[in-house]
Amino acid sequence: MQDKYTPADIERAAQQHWDKTGAARAVEDATKPKYYCLSMFPYPSGKLHMGHVRNYTIGDVLSRFHKMQGYNVLQPMGWDAFGMPAENAALQNNVPPAGWTYSNIDYMRQQLKSLGFAIDWEREFATCTPEYYRWEQWLFTRLYEKGLVYKKLGTVNWDPVDHTVLANEQVIDGRGWRSGALIEKREIPMYYMKITAYAEELLSELDNLPGWPEQVRLMQKNWIGKSTGVRFAFPLADNPDEKLWVFTTRADTIMGVTFVAVAAEHPLATKAAANNPELAAFIEECKKGGVAEADIATMEKKGMPTGIYVTHPLTGQQVEVWVGNYVLMSYGDGAVMAVPAHDERDFAFALKYNLPIKQVVAVDGETAFSHEAWAEWYADKAKGKLVNSGKYDGLGYEAAVDAIAADLAAKNLGDKKVQFRLRDWGISRQRYWGCPIPIIHCKTCGDVPVPDDQLPVVLPENVEITGAGSPLAKMPEFYECQCPKCGGDARRETDTMDTFFESSWYFLRYACPDNTTAMVDERVAYWCKGGIDQYIGGIEHAILHLLYSRFFTKLMRDVGLIGDLGEPFANLLTQGMVVAPTFYRELDGGKKQWINPADVDVVTDERGRPTGATLKTDGLPVVIGGTEKMSKSKNNGVDPQALIDQYGADTARLFIMFASPPDQSLEWSDAGVEGAYRFLRRLWKTTYDHLQAGLVAASTSNDGLSSAQADLRRKLHQTMGKVADDYGRRKQFNTAIAAVMELLNAYDKCDLKDAAGRALAQESLESIALLLFPIVPHIGQALYAQLRPGADAGNAAFPKADPAALKQDEIELMVQVNGKLRGAIRVSAEADKATIEATALANEDAIKFMEGKPAKKVIVVPGRLVNIVA
């Protein structure tokens, strides 16, 4: 064994050994419990960032630990390879998206391998290959035939200069990110998946996910948004047979309706605008706004009257219809009743446009109702009683809703209804780099699914990206085709699927990526029954990706592709962000030049707090910004490859796992990286020093050990239990590492020169190599092979605590006098309460601080302390 720790050589040798032996290859084995550990697959953007490294290190630690625990482990990897960034990169670099993507995959794969992750690379796939996306095209046609995929008009952001549809994030201050043109809202035909048919199941099954963070479950519940309310109609004043429908969760306030607002796209708005140029212009202005809910929530609320009136279903009074820019056509009926007195948004709108405000709820003990200023109690439904509501006066919320719903039902104008905030999933994207939608448009036969024998519809890869619309729509060789039904000339669909489609089932494909004849097979039942055992990814995916994946497993179950596997992810760990300090200089025009922390010298005070910073190249000051998530935009990232090249993968892994619990933010620290490297060098040197005296058999009992050595062995076996619990149940890797560091400190302090001590040293170092192997597998592999020639740490069992080693002849108890720590005593581990009390009262320190006073009471906390009250 060489005396110096050389990570590059050690890690190269370990990785070659794992490749040669197929250490990470997973094969179904009914004799073992399975453990499917999956970290969310990456988008191949070019290089790994520290967020990737943290995510995949967590997964690797859990995978390696469970393999050592006797599980049959699967840890796969693939590439979420479709998406807009590839088109943007193609535009900037003048290369086709496919070439850019495949090149990035090759580089990032090598980076992942250099980190020593135990990934079964035989299962690797990229979602942009026809071998993968052919199956989602196949599934699309099945769902289309069953009505679970359908076509309807959808609202999109339209760039009138580039003649293309923009994603919400491509609209900046109402303008196209590339052209700068004012964006319009347009309705175009799009394909939707009927996720609303599964809303109730998606909601109720959240209660069967105890292994998920409560925050994520709550976010999904809110997104699905189950509301119990009343759907009712306002008959049109000039044509009572025509009705305007609305849904409300506050039917108790129906007597306070003073106007109704409809979306700009609502048929009533269109009808009213036909002879009203001013209203038509306002509707067009509304259509130029964003289509995202977040945009609508924050923008200024505007409206205009339509001149149309409807009849209140209970009072018979005329109610004016307005167009409101805050009403979504895609939610409910595209219309809302407005009760300004008891809804803050309606109140502000009514004040702005001088509309009536009618109070219909009062709360005892509150201030008087004011038509000029909003008060929180106006919206209180728990304590309120109806007023100014005719026969409903005096009723509370529930009684009022029941009575009002019954009266509406009697008039055939409404009833109670459960409604969901969740909307059907629009999967059409007017972009190039995605999975082609397998539909052919025929003038005679309509929309025809592509037959199985013509799948996959292959996406052309050698294209030129201009940024103005999808190239597919300009490629007759792609879209010109024959109708599969009648054989006549037809046109292929040029929209592609939302990239969430690919990531909604990829975890199932890992079970059988080599199957060329079916989307999935029976191996899915082995690996995925009861859910993926551990799923790891950022909380930013809490809603869409995780919700769509849950939806897909239910869809695929119902079309007979898979059995009832239950929820797809049994346990979810949402890792925290990797953050680092930021530095910048102010430029002309208020812009900031962000400077990488590696290029800055920081001055700190005696407490280590930064007081100033200068740029290394010119020595001039830079501004210290906040600590923020590592990002390209703030230039505060650390290149994982540079870290690996300087310190090795094990140091990177050790620091990342030690710096914070996995679900908390990790603050980058160069000093912390240095500390991790020093620890590994120390561990190497400690093992080297032990082996210089020759190999010995590891101790298996306390026979022949001194008292101090027995204490060390006890600590060793206590550490085994703690680390196993930290890895498995608690998933607190930082405390596991801290426990091993404490153990090594105790090892260094113990005299281990005699024969029994040498055997204990052997047992300790073998165990430490295995305890740390899931986190630092390269050095763990190398040290264990030196300590146990011919043995392979990757095939070793995780160290298990020996109950006999944990037994103590004597225990130490702290002694307090009047609640203050004053000393310590050692007593037999079997000592009874009377013996412990007597020993404590005889302790010199206790006697001194009792100051001659008698003991009024002696409190014994077993195994911990004795408190004497004097």
From Swiss-Prot:
GO cellular component: cytosol
Major subcellular site: cytoplasm
Reaction(s) catalysed by this chain's protein: tRNA(Leu) + L-leucine + ATP = L-leucyl-tRNA(Leu) + AMP + diphosphate
CDD domains (alphabetical): Anticodon_Ia_Leu_BEm, LeuRS_core
Enzyme class: ligase
The protein's Enzyme Commission number: 6.1.1.4
Subcellular location(s) per record: Cytoplasm
Entry keyword set: Aminoacyl-tRNA synthetase, ATP-binding, Cytoplasm, Ligase, Nucleotide-binding, Protein biosynthesis
Example GO biological process: leucyl-tRNA aminoacylation
PROSITE patterns assigned to the protein according to its UniProt record, in alphabetical order: AA_TRNA_LIGASE_I
Tagged with keyword Protein biosynthesis: yes
Biological source species: Dechloromonas aromatica (strain RCB)
Binding site for ATP: K632
Family under the similarity heading: Belongs to the class-I aminoacyl-tRNA synthetase family.
Keyword Protein biosynthesis found: yes
Record-given protein name: Leucine--tRNA ligase
